Amino acid sequence: MKPLFISATGTGVGKSYTTQKLLQSLHQSGRKPLALKPIETGANPTPEDALLHLQLMQKLQLDQGLSLEEICLERYKLPASPWVSAKKEGRCVDVDHLLRRLLEFQKRSDPLLIEGAGGLLVPLLKEYFMIDLAEALEAHMVLVISGKLGGINEALLSLEALQHRQMSYTLVLNLWEEEKRSFEEISAPYWKERPERLFRLDSELEELTQTLLSAI
C-alpha cells in the first residue's frame, strides 16, 4: 500500500487539519493509519503539528507507542524552509535517514499519512525538494488547495509540477469560514470545468477517504 503524502499550495492552507481529518476518517473506516510530520520548522522547542498528530493517535489508540521524536524525525527552530532552517543551525537535512525511517513506518501503517512542510517545491536541500521526497516514496499526493483569491494560480502551478513527474494525486479543498461565500463566485466556476475531481473537506470527507484508499 502506497503512503499518502499531504501537501498544499502553500503554508497555512490546511495540511495539518486535513491530515487530522483523514486520520479520523480512516480510523472510522476500520483502518489503522499512522500520521507523521517528518520535518517541522518553527519548532521552538516543540513541533506543534507533530504533537497534534501524536495526541490524536493516542486518543484513537493508533500511536503504537511512538514518541514525538519518531513522529517528527527532524525539527528546526527557524520558521523557514528546512534547508534554510537547517543551515542556520549548522545542520543538513538527512534525506537518506528520512527515507529509510519512512519506509519502515510504511510497513506498520494502514496506511501511512505523511504531512509535508510548506508546498511541493520547498527545499530540503539546495537542489532537493519536498516533491522529491514524495516521489522517492512513490506516494500518492493529497494536494490541499485554498479557496482564496489567487488560489487557482497557486493550485495550477502545483499541478504542473505533479503532472511533469507523472505523480498520482487527489485534490482537496479546505475552505476557511471567511472563504466559503467568495469561493462559490470567484473559484468554483473554474474548478467545475476541470477534469479532476475537487473534494471538499467539509462535506465530502467519507467519499474522499474511499477514493484515496482505492488509489493506493
Swiss-Prot record:
According to its UniProt entry, one GO biological process term is: biotin biosynthetic process
Determine if Transport is one of this entry's keywords.
no
Give the cofactors, semicolon-separated. Answer: Mg(2+)
Q: Which GO terms describe its molecular function?
A: ATP binding; dethiobiotin synthase activity; magnesium ion binding
Q: Which Gene3D superfamilies match?
A: P-loop containing nucleotide triphosphate hydrolases
Q: Where does ATP bind?
A: G12, V13, G14, K15, S16, Y17, E115, G116, A117, G118
Q: Where is the active site?
A: K37
Q: Where in the cell is it found?
A: Cytoplasm
Q: Which residues bind Mg(2+)?
A: S16, H53, E115
> Does the record bear Aminoacyl-tRNA synthetase in its keywords?
no
Q: Give the matching Pfam families.
A: AAA_26
Q: Which residues bind substrate per the record? A: T41
Q: What InterPro entries does the record tag this protein with?
A: DTB_synth_BioD, P-loop_NTPase
This protein's GO CC annotations: cytosol
EC identifiers of the protein = 6.3.3.3
Pathway this chain belongs to: Cofactor biosynthesis; biotin biosynthesis; biotin from 7,8-diaminononanoate: step 1/2
Q: Please list the reactions this protein catalyses.
A: (7R,8S)-7,8-diammoniononanoate + CO2 + ATP = (4R,5S)-dethiobiotin + ADP + phosphate + 3 H(+)
Keywords in alphabetical order: ATP-binding, Biotin biosynthesis, Cytoplasm, Ligase, Magnesium, Metal-binding, Nucleotide-binding
Annotated TM spans: none
Instruction: State the family named in the UniProt similarity comment for this chain.
Output: Belongs to the dethiobiotin synthetase family.
Q: Subunit comment for this entry? A: Homodimer.
Function, please?
Catalyzes a mechanistically unusual reaction, the ATP-dependent insertion of CO2 between the N7 and N8 nitrogen atoms of 7,8-diaminopelargonic acid (DAPA, also called 7,8-diammoniononanoate) to form a ureido ring.
**HAMAP family reported for this sequence:** BioD
Identify this protein by name: ATP-dependent dethiobiotin synthetase BioD
